[in-house]
Amino acid sequence: MVLKVKMGDIGVAKSPESIETLLGSCVAIILYDRGKKIGGVAHVMLPKSRNSSEKNPGKYANTAIPELINRMAKLGARKDKLTTKLAGGAAMFKCNSNTIDVGKKNIEASREEVKKMGLRIASEDLGGDTGRTITLSLKDGSVLVRTGSELKTI
């Protein structure tokens, strides 16, 4: 079964399921506990929430990661066993000096928050100007990234 994660949402599951999301300028924060075969994806839309009691914690990098870790822990995952991967953050629209590159800001914030949580990024597929679909296999923690007709595993 495939768990589909919508924009600004968080999904967690155990093997043999997989988790999938479609990304543009958003960033997927992907965590996986290899020993327990538990994984999760946060579909981050924006860099930071100023509200610590955010109703939709998956929407922001600074609230998504702690919530993702908590939800995975409820299934039995351990923070010290997590592998971290990032994908997304495309520049979907032409940016000029007067516009903000949301994809770039999401990448920067996601990396910063991962570091703050004491996690290390194992691999990533970030940036560019094309959206992508990612699928996390909870059997082995591999992440299939589809960008147009291109496929790669991170």
UniProtKB/Swiss-Prot annotation:
The keyword Hydrolase applies. One of its GO terms (biological process) is chemotaxis. GO terms for molecular function: protein-glutamine glutaminase activity. It comes from the Archaea. Disulfide bonds: none annotated. Coiled coil: none annotated. Keywords: Chemotaxis, Hydrolase. It is an enzyme of class 3 (hydrolase). Probably deamidates glutamine residues to glutamate on methyl-accepting chemotaxis receptors (MCPs), playing an important role in chemotaxis. This is Probable chemoreceptor glutamine deamidase CheD. It comes from Methanococcus maripaludis (strain DSM 14266 / JCM 13030 / NBRC 101832 / S2 / LL). The gene is cheD.
